[in-house]
Amino acid sequence: MELTQENTEENEKTHVESIVKFEDSNRGTITDFHIETANNEEEKDANVILNKSVKMEVEEVNGHVDSSSTETDIEMQVIQQPTIPKKPPVSAHRRGPRKHRGNANSQLNLSTADHQRPLYCICQKPDDGSWMLGCDGCEDWFHGTCVNIPESYNDLTVQYFCPKCTEEGKGITTWKRKCRLRECSNPTRPNSNYCSDKHGVDFFREKVKLSTVEPSAIKNLVLFAKKREEFQNLGTVGPTLPSQVPPEVVYNFEIEEANRLNAEIVQLNKEKEVASNKKIFLQLIKDSSRRAVLAYKEREGIKKDLCGFDSRLLFNQQQMNELWEKVSNGAPLSLDMSIDPSPESTCFTEKRRCAKHTSWQVIFTEDFELQESNILQKLNMKQTAKDVMLEHQKQRCLPGIQYDGYARFCHEQLSPEKMANLLK
């Protein structure tokens, strides 16, 4: 009986020692797991909980575990103990200037003490998640809507200075060259006006749609130009027209029209000369009438103003030509000449009582000027018609392309190969 009790006590002692060894071995594993997953304060709490758990297990084994208990049951009880999850680290980070700011919840570090959010921009409002850009002078953030810069210009900004920094002289905002396509906000490629070949083609397609020139004519013009500079210079230099028109390009009706125009131009030039002589003749008659009136007033002792109209102003063209020939002796009529007074043709009636010749000087002056003006207008019309017809004759010597009118190029500008491509 005593032997049996001793064996039982030894078995219980051995069983307890094995449990303690098993717990010691598992304690290291669990402790390592908590060290890797928890912070320093959480590790201390986990060790305390683990020590208490081991003591409770040992007491439970000593008090309640019978000889049928196994190590597997105790192991499952220890493994099922709850673990403490670790807290994710929280850090604040503010990105550099000219970067897109994301969601406010992920970008702003809310203060745990007063829960105040930082204020930005000239509007002094917090980050609401809209697009902002940073100033390279004061390194503050500004809403794009507050400084009138759209978000699409983000990639075009080289450096940005807010209005205050610009006013203080810290710098000015600089930009990259924008693609010429209106709806594109990308920067251009080096040595180009476009961000891509596609946008270059799209840009000129829009230009062609707005042009009044037919697309086929533009194609011919492109074929004519070998380089971009040549295409840009089209139309800046006109074609070289021949000085003489070859007879083979002149039509018969144009010959008749040219003869008629030449005859009319000759006649109008003669009328122009006559009108000019009439104005000179009027001035000479005024001088002659003044001398005749003065002589008459001295002879008659009259102090009142007299009419002084000279009826020689009413001469027909033939009579005027004879008088001019007599005055000028065959030379062109000029104001340096003079006409002898003629008392027989001069009116010596009191000026205010002569209703027949009222304002005769003004009337004849305006009449002769109007005659000359009408003749000059007719002469210009005839000369313009002659020049247009001659221009058409010269243009028929040149190759032409029809496009809302005619674009013409001289032979010297085109090689035979280009001429063939141009006239296809």
Swiss-Prot record:
Protein name: Set1 complex component spp1
Subunit-level organization: Component of the Set1 complex composed of ash2, sdc1, set1, shg1, spp1, swd1, swd2 and swd3.
Function: The Set1 complex specifically methylates 'Lys-4' of histone H3.
Pfam families linked: PHD
GO function term, MF aspect, one: zinc ion binding
Localization in the cell: Nucleus
Positions of region (Disordered): 80-108
Gene Ontology biological process terms in this record: positive regulation of DNA-templated transcription; transcription initiation-coupled chromatin remodeling
Transmembrane segment boundaries: none
ZnF region ranges: PHD-type: 118-168
Entries under PANTHER family matching the protein: CXXC-TYPE ZINC FINGER PROTEIN 1
InterPro entries for the chain: Spp1/CFP1, Zinc_finger_PHD-type_CS, Znf_FYVE_PHD, Znf_PHD, Znf_PHD-finger, Znf_RING/FYVE/PHD
Composition bias type Basic residues, residue spans: 92-102
Gene Ontology cellular component annotations, sorted alphabetically: chromatin; cytosol; nucleus; Set1C/COMPASS complex
Keywords tagged on the record: Metal-binding, Nucleus, Zinc, Zinc-finger
